[in-house]
Amino acid sequence: MKIHEYQGKEILRKFGVAVPRGKPAFSVDEAVKVAEELGGPVWVVKAQIHAGGRGKGGGVKVAKSLDQVREYANQILGMQLKTHQTGPEGQKVNRLLIEEGADIKKELYVGIVIDRVSQKVVVMASSEGGMDIEEVAEKTPEAIHKVAVEPSTGLQDAEADDLAKKIGVPDASIPQAREILKGLYKSFWETDASLAEINPLVLTGDGKVIALDAKFNFDSNALFRHPEIVAYRDLDEEDPAEIEASKFDLAYISLDGNIGCLVNGAGLAMATMDTIKLFGGEPANFLDVGGGATTEKVTEAFKLMLKNPGLKAILVNIFGGIMRCDVIAEGVIAGSKAVNLNVPLVVRMKGTNEDLGKKMLAESGLPIISADSMEEAAQKVVAAAAGK
C-alpha cells in the first residue's frame, strides 16, 4: 500500500525526523489559507499523487507571494499529472501539500528496503539526492553507500554516522543526520514498511538537515495490525479494477497488454506472463485466484478482465494441487456463460482431477481452446489475440 507525501511526513515527524512545516489542502482557498497560517516569504505548492517525478511534470511550484500560491494551486489541482511513474494517462491531482520554503544548500538521498539476499533491512544513502535512485545506481553506483542492519540491534549510532560522513554531511550536522537515519529506520521497522525513502534529504544554509520529501510503501499483508496506516489509504489513487478484485480476495494488477491471464499461484502467474511475452504476446493483467478459487471467484475474475476494452484473448492456466481442475472447469464454464464471453479462451489444466476437468470443458458446448503444455497454451493465446 502506498500513501501520500504529507502522510509520510506525518509518520516521520512522529519518529523525530525533521520535516518542513506544512499542511494538505483540498481546494485553492484552503491552499491560500494554509500559506497564510505558515507565513512567508516562500512556499512550496506540491501535487499529492502516488508517483514520483512530480516536479518534472509541473506538479511542484515555488511561490513567493500568496497570489502565486493561489495561481499555482489553481493550476495543479485537478490537473492530469503525467510522470515517468504514472504512464501516459497520468494521475488526477485531488490534493496539495503547502509547505514553507527551505534554503537548500545540498540535496542527499536516504532510503530503506529489504534485501532478500542478505535477508536484512538495508539502509542506503547517496550524495546524489533529488534524482531517481535507480538512475544513480545505473550511472554512478559508487555514489550509493549501504548498511545491512542486524535486526537484533537495529541501526547503530556508528553506522548512521558513517553513512552521513560518506555522503558529505559536515561534522557539525552529523548528530542531526544520525537522528534522521535512526528515525527513518525505526519508522520503517515499526510500521511494517517495504520501502521508506527521503529524496531529497537536504542540508540548509544554516546547517540544518531536513527531509523535503517522504515516500513509504507498506506490506499489505501486515495492514491488519496497523489501522492507523490503513486510515491513510486513498482509493482515488488506486486502480478501480484492483479495488474490485480485493473484494473477492483476488490478487489482480492491471498491465498494458491485450491477453488476460487467470492463474492459480503467484509464481505460476509470473511464469505464464513470461511465456506469453516469450512468444510475442503482451499480458493485460496479473491475476492469481489462489488455492481456493470458487465458481464465484472465477466469474468475478472474468468480469474484471472483460472490463478492459483492449482485451483480445484470455488464458486460463491452472495447476491442480490444492485446487481441483474440475472445480476450475466448473468456474470457467459458469463464468464464461455469466459474462457472455466474447473473446477467445485458451485453457490449460494439469493436476488433480485433470481428466474430469478437461471432459467438462469439452462437453460444455463453449468454444474453448485446449492446450496441454504452458508453451502450447501461450502460443495459442498469442495467435488468438492476433486474430489468427
From Swiss-Prot:
Disulfide bonds: none annotated. Transmembrane segments: none annotated. Its cofactor is Mg(2+). Binds 1 Mg(2+) ion per subunit. GO terms for molecular function: ATP binding; magnesium ion binding; succinate-CoA ligase (ADP-forming) activity; succinate-CoA ligase (GDP-forming) activity. It catalyses: succinate + ATP + CoA = succinyl-CoA + ADP + phosphate; GTP + succinate + CoA = succinyl-CoA + GDP + phosphate. Its EC number is 6.2.1.5. InterPro entries: ATP-grasp, ATP-grasp_succ-CoA_synth-type, ATP_grasp_subdomain_1, Succ-CoA_synthase_bsu_CS, SUCC_ACL_C, Succ_CoA_ligase-like_bsu, Succinyl-CoA_synth-like. Pathway: Carbohydrate metabolism; tricarboxylic acid cycle; succinate from succinyl-CoA (ligase route): step 1/1. ATP binds at residues 46, 53-55, 99, 102, 107. Residues 9-244 form the ATP-grasp domain. Belongs to the succinate/malate CoA ligase beta subunit family. PANTHER family: SUCCINATE--COA LIGASE [GDP-FORMING] SUBUNIT BETA, MITOCHONDRIAL, SUCCINYL-COA SYNTHETASE BETA CHAIN. Heterotetramer of two alpha and two beta subunits. Succinyl-CoA synthetase functions in the citric acid cycle (TCA), coupling the hydrolysis of succinyl-CoA to the synthesis of either ATP or GTP and thus represents the only step of substrate-level phosphorylation in the TCA. The beta subunit provides nucleotide specificity of the enzyme and binds the substrate succinate, while the binding sites for coenzyme A and phosphate are found in the alpha subunit. This is Succinate--CoA ligase [ADP-forming] subunit beta. It comes from Burkholderia thailandensis (strain ATCC 700388 / DSM 13276 / CCUG 48851 / CIP 106301 / E264). The lineage of its organism: Bacteria, Pseudomonadati, Pseudomonadota, Betaproteobacteria, Burkholderiales. The gene is sucC.
